[in-house]
Regions:
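A structured, charge-rich N-terminal accessory region that forms the first stable segment of a protein
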Residues: 6-67, 71
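Phosphate/anion-contacting hairpin/loop surfaces
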Residues: 43-197
Length: 197
């Protein structure tokens, strides 16, 4: 199943009541593209799978368990350091973007309350998982990216990859929707939704 903006937003809305307020117990990296978070929330244990696999990128709850490497990769160790014991305080997307933000709070070694964010980009070959501080400064990423158009590296600011389309969620009336539809080169709803909205 392809993860477009509609599906991503729908899944996030389903995850919220189960996971917000939950605490991270364990973190695994079973493959180079996958992160698994074990979460205790509302008296239940949940397993949240985050995948940056270009062909099967996704986010969602799972009961399927993959074998984990005997030695945890570096990014997994970093996530364990910063996230185990943290509480999930929000899960969100921006409109119909395919970037999911999971916000955590935890106490550091000085007993100060700190906020961290885990961004999951569900975008085929550009899929990635990024850990930042409260100000969106990257702590580390599953995949380092250094290109002319975008850099995803530690100490850099994380910037959303926005789709330059008008979100139908921002349209205030049927007339606005009709005008957007009517001004498009596409004349069928199935084509205009992905291309213009």
């Amino acid at each position: 199943m392809a993860f477009d903006g509609f599906i991503t937003k729908s899944i996030i809305e389903e995850l919220k009541p189960h996971l917000i307020g939950g605490k991270i117990n364990k973190v695994f990296e079973p493959t180079k593209n996958d992160i698994v978070l074990s979460i205790y929330s509302n008296g239940n244990n949940y397993t949240l799978a985050l995948s940056s696999n270009p062909e099967t990128c996704r986010i969602g709850l799972t009961t399927y368990s993959k074998p984990n490497p005997q030695v945890a990769p570096n990014f997994c160790m970093l996530l364990r350091k910063y996230l185990i014991g943290s509480k999930i305080i929000d899960i969100s997307t921006m409109d119909l973007e395919r970037t999911v933000q999971i916000k955590f709070e935890a106490y550091n070694e000085l007993n100060d309350l700190v906020i961290r964010k885990l961004f999951v980009e569900i975008m085929s070959r550009q899929s990635n998982i990024i850990l930042t501080n409260e100000n969106n400064i990257i702590i580390d990423t599953l995949k380092h990216v250094e290109s002319g158009t975008r850099e995803l590296l530690p100490a850099h600011e994380f910037e959303f990859t926005a789709i330059n389309k008008e979100s139908f969620l921002k349209l205030n009336s049927f007339d606005e929707f009709y005008n957007t539809f009517n001004s498009s080169d596409e004349k069928t709803l199935s084509k205009i939704m992905p291309s213009q909205l």
